[in-house]
Amino acid sequence: KNSIKKSFKYLNKMKKSENDYSKDGALEFWSSGGLMQTIEPSGRPETYDYVNINPKHIEVIVLAKGKAAVAMYYSEGNMKPKNSSEVSHYLTRVSQTFVKEDGEWKTRTSHWSPVMGGSGTTQTGKE
């Protein structure tokens, strides 16, 4: 839970995602409904004009103690990705798989899907 909260604090402050991805990269489905995205170990490149998103109701299921876990939570707020449309009520369900590498939890998979009454991101690619 703390890794997720820390990642969102970084996102909101720096207006870009923290590089918390596995050394093997990750696969993601984004809330825009597009195709699967391959994320390189260097992380997601997008930046935001503004972003204020927070995780809520985080639940973690341990798959292998100290090695792998799945987190499920909601992500809510607003954002304006650079070169994309504003999302005034971003509200998604999130499922993420984490692996422990060099003592740190790293993202291996993510699936973001909009919740009824909210919207997903307007981004459809990694540009």
Model-found features: residue ranges?
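Short, low-complexity N-terminal intrinsically disordered segments enriched in polar/charged residues
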Residues: 1-20, 119-127
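Extracytoplasmic/secreted envelope proteins and their assembly/folding machinery
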Residues: 4-8, 39-42, 95
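Short solvent-exposed beta->alpha transition segments
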Residues: 18-54
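Short, well-ordered beta-strand segments in beta-rich or mixed alpha/beta enzyme
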Residues: 18-31, 68-79, 97
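Surface-exposed, charged secondary-structure patches
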Residues: 40-86
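Glycine-rich beta-strand-turn "strand-cap" elements at beta-sheet edges
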Residues: 56-64, 112-116, 125
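A short acidic/glycine-rich loop-to-helix N-cap element
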Residues: 82-88, 117-123
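Short beta-strand edge/turn micro-motifs at domain boundaries
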Residues: 91-120
